[in-house]
Structure formats: structure tokens, C-alpha cells
């Protein structure tokens, strides 16, 4: 568990935070440049020193301004991966990985190297590596120090799109197989969507929202970040069944289900899906003989006018689903809070 209750002033920028983060999964730190994202993880890592408050990791006090406690970075058991890999140029990859490696990680070396796909790189110098390869080595080096917490400061920011696509699957694999909590700084919605379990939104050094990804994603705090044509719902689902005759998989959403193209995931596996509001249409009665496979019973929570369109907030199985319709459709269907209807979903994408 990471307890953050401190304030810090750097120049004209002030960061104030009072949150407790669980000791598992990935928490994305999100916001514009200057919002306080890097300042936050620098304070946690010990690179900067808050003037007030405390930082406590798993019961160990890292900072306590009142008591004059401020552990040095090497005593915090916190790994840090920077935007640039910062590898030692005169050491081969193997030497970079073993630098600072904890004794407890010696037996984990081969497993971690395989997990990150860097076996072929062990005898190469950093100068011969691509940007994505360097970042994989940097992540491996940080993990081999046996940290209780891993900080990643926009690790994909300096990479071009092909290299980002190369590294993203390795980060996803780490989230599944390495039981170390991570704080992931980013201003990329795509990275957050594919990696984060929770999101903390910072603005001018203040926490504007903090919670599960699907909750924060659907909140008004994210509206400025989401283009109107990309308003969407993020939903947690589980694999229910695989169709015996067609290449389709059913996902459980409350007591209803969604059909998607066949997945290789086992039954009961937890997944996260994204549904664009523009891919959801509404009808008052269940349609007959339709090509749309996913028709869910839903209740209208509210509706909002938005630049000539209407955003309809629906409840399906205790979760929020958004639909975008025209004012004409709203009036003809008499959309109002409490109305029960059917949501036809044309497309579903798997995000994690």
C-alpha cells in the first residue's frame, strides 16, 4: 500500500496530494504537461523532497517532513524507468541488467529476461539497440533490484509508433505476471486504456479524479480529453462461453452477455472491453430477425445535449454504457431517466 499525504513546491508549481494506492496493478498518472505527474513520482522515488507531509510504502516511512525523515533513493526499494533508458553505454545488456541486481533476484534472472524477450540482446551494447529494446532492458534492470514499487515516467514517449507497438505487449505481459504495483505516468489515452487498472488525473498539482479506469473514463473529468466522436464506455467482463458452431465468444455483462469474435481466453477470464457511443443505437422493443448480435436491455440514467447530438447514459448490469443519438431520435423515443429500452451494439473492441 502506498500512502501519499504531502505537499511540495517547486518554483511556481505546487503539488498537493492525499490518496492511498493499493499494492497491486497499474495506476496511471494522467494529465497535461505541468500537471504534476513527474513531480509526484520524483517525490516518491526520493529525487525531490516534499516540504510537508508523509509518504509511506507498505508501512515503511519514506518521507516525514515533521520528523525530518527522508530516505535516500537507494534505500526506498522503488524502481524507476525514465523516458530515456539511461543504460550504461560501456556495459553490455547482461552487465546493465546485473548492475544493482538484488541477491533475491538471482534465480529470477532467466525468467525475467524471457518475459521481456531480451535473451538475444544479452551480449550486445546499448548503442546497437532500438529504442524499444533499450526500454525493455531498462524495465528489466529496474525489476531486478527487487523493488516494492515500480515507477514508469512515460516510457513510450520517446518511441515512434512501430516501437510503441513493439513494447506495449511486453508491458501488458508484465501486468499479468509480475506482482509488483506500478505507477505509470502518461498523457496517452491509448496507453492508459491498454495498461491501467486505475487512473489518477492531475491538474495544476491537484487530484481531479482517482479510481478504477472504467469509472474515471466515464466521468466528466475525462470529457476534455475524449474527442466527441470517441465518447466510449469501458466495461469489465468475463468470458462466459465459446459458441459450439461459430467463431464467437460470449462475454458476461451482469446477467446479460455480449458476443465478440472468438477469443483464445479460458472461461471465467477477466477482460476489459471498449464500446464507442456511436456504435450503440436504441430501440423501445426487442428487434426481430436482426443481424446485430448484441441487444441488451438497459435503463436510461440521463441524457445530455452536445453540439447537435445527444449523449445518453444507460445502465446495463450495474455498469454505465453510453449511446449517441440525434435530437430527433431522442424526441421520437421520448428518452427520459428511468425509461427501459434496448441497446443495439454494433461493435466491441477488447482492450485488456
From Swiss-Prot:
Query: Mind listing the UniProt keywords for this protein, alphabetically?
Result: ATP-binding, Cell inner membrane, Cell membrane, Membrane, Molybdenum, Nucleotide-binding, Translocase, Transport
Q: Which part of the chain is the ABC transporter domain?
A: 1-229
The species this protein belongs to is: Escherichia coli O6:H1 (strain CFT073 / ATCC 700928 / UPEC)
Q: Where is the Mop domain?
A: 289-352
Residues the entry annotates as binding ATP: 31-38
Task: Name the membrane topology term.
Answer: Peripheral membrane protein
Q: Where in the cell is it found?
A: Cell inner membrane
Q: Name one GO cellular component term.
A: plasma membrane
Q: Which gene encodes it?
A: modC
The record's GO molecular-function terms, alphabetically, read:
ABC-type molybdate transporter activity; ATP binding; ATP hydrolysis activity
For this entry, the protein name equals Molybdenum import ATP-binding protein ModC
What PROSITE patterns does its record include?
A: ABC_TRANSPORTER_1, ABC_TRANSPORTER_2, MODC, MOP
**Superkingdom of the organism of origin:** Bacteria
Q: EC class of this enzyme?
A: translocase
Q: What catalytic reaction does the record list?
A: molybdate(out) + ATP + H2O = molybdate(in) + ADP + phosphate + H(+)
Which family does the similarity line name? Belongs to the ABC transporter superfamily. Molybdate importer (TC 3.A.1.8) family.
